[in-house]
Amino acid sequence: MSSDFEGYEQDFAVLTAEITSKIARVPRLPPDEKKQMVANVEKQLEEARELLEQMDLEVREIPPQSRGMYSNRMRSYKQEMGKLETDFKRSRIAYSDEVRNELLGDAGNSSENQRAHLLDNTERLERSSRRLEAGYQIAVETEQIGQEMLENLSHDREKIQRARDRLRDADANLGKSSRILTGMLRRIIQNRILLVILGIIVVIAILTAIAFFVKGH
């Protein structure tokens, strides 16, 4: 699955590089070529959106414990896509103003100044938004790192607990084995004592029989 994601990543990188280059060229092109270039960029932006959707689907299939890194990369790609779309909108606005000025002459100069001022304010807002997104991403990454550390600590605690349980079981088994061996040793000693007593009794009986036999003669 990760190979598919990386393949989409490479396609997305190549495509966004082409889009960036074409957006930068739009202001310097003649009117006819600009129109064609704008249409071409629109088509490539749609292809880039489709690639992002495919990458997003791939990320959703990744197990949760391995998804964090890919999710961060997806956020970065979406931010890059948003910047491309913003740059393209500016390029289209400039292109539309240029076409309109060619049709209306100097009558649109004041409107163009207002639009430039509006674009400047929009750019400031977008920079602030990007800073907020970067701060949010850092906070999310920090939270994920903390969560991973807690999970690792939890796993380590479980391992220690299992090892402790195994030691406790082994200690209990050793105690049980010791009791069994002690009982067996006690029975062996008792059996040997009985054998000695029986041997003594047999010897005494034999000696007594011999004594009676000698006295009888």
Curated annotation (Swiss-Prot):
Transmembrane segments: 193-213
Pfam name, any one: V-SNARE_C
Cytoplasmic topological domain: 1-192
Disulfide bond sites: none
Entries under SMART domains matching the protein: t_SNARE
GO biological process, one term: vesicle fusion with Golgi apparatus
Keyword Protein transport included in the entry's annotation: yes
Keywords linked to the UniProt accession: Coiled coil, Golgi apparatus, Membrane, Protein transport, Transmembrane, Transmembrane helix, Transport
SUPFAM superfamilies reported for this sequence: SNARE fusion complex (SSF58038), t-snare proteins (SSF47661)
Subcellular location: Golgi apparatus membrane
Vesicular side: 214-217
Subunit comment: Interacts with distinct SNARE complexes that contain either STX5 or STX6. Interacts with NAPA and, to a lesser extent, with NAPG. Identified in a complex containing STX6, STX12, VAMP4 and VTI1A.
Known function: V-SNARE that mediates vesicle transport pathways through interactions with t-SNAREs on the target membrane. These interactions are proposed to mediate aspects of the specificity of vesicle trafficking and to promote fusion of the lipid bilayers. Involved in vesicular transport from the late endosomes to the trans-Golgi network. Along with VAMP7, involved in an non-conventional RAB1-dependent traffic route to the cell surface used by KCNIP1 and KCND2. May be concerned with increased secretion of cytokines associated with cellular senescence.
PANTHER family: VESICLE TRANSPORT THROUGH INTERACTION WITH T-SNARES HOMOLOG 1A, VESICLE TRANSPORT V-SNARE PROTEIN VTI1-RELATED
Protein name: Vesicle transport through interaction with t-SNAREs homolog 1A
